[in-house]
């Protein structure tokens, strides 16, 4: 490294004769490093929905935008408490049968940070048309982004137990 802020090595630089910073005597102040700006944060509630016969719900993300076309566990925006999460599950036409665990996770993308609250619960019903109910084999065949890694690991372990 030759062109370093606070410690320039102009003598070793092949471009020293062309350098505007050196000509202006600014080499100890350039280049200027940009400070990391805070990433916007987004709260999500993720649902690891399982059935008594050993399947879990997945849905495909939209074809445009972040993680487009990949598979995800059903989720909604916001950090829902258990009562609100139960209402969200009911809106999908599912009946919560047994709440099993609450999992939290964080995933940092280059431009946004997700804070996820997850609920694992056994449900009855088919849910919306965009839900795919996957067994262990079907889950492993789906491209689920690492953002949902904690939930994927939990789902895979639960489906193996079935």
Write out the residue ranges for each language-model feature:
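Intrinsically disordered, low-complexity, charged terminal extensions of DNA damage-control enzymes
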Residues: 1-162
């Amino acid at each position: 490294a030759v062109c370093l802020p606070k410690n320039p090595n102009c003598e070793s630089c092949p471009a020293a004769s062309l350098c505007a910073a050196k000509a202006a005597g600014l080499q100890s102040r350039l280049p200027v490093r940009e400070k990391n700006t805070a990433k916007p944060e987004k709260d999500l509630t993720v649902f690891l929905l399982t059935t008594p016969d050993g399947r879990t719900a997945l849905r495909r993300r939209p074809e445009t935008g972040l993680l487009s076309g990949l598979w995800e566990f059903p989720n909604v925006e916001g950090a829902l408490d258990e009562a609100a999460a139960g209402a969200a599950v009911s809106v999908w036409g599912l009946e919560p049968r047994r709440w099993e665990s609450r999992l939290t996770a964080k995933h940092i993308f280059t431009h946004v940070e997700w804070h996820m609250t997850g609920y694992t619960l056994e449900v009855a019903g088919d849910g919306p048309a965009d839900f795919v109910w996957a067994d262990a084999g079907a889950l492993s065949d789906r491209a689920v982004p690492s953002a949902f890694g904690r939930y994927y690991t939990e789902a895979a372990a639960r489906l193996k137990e079935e």
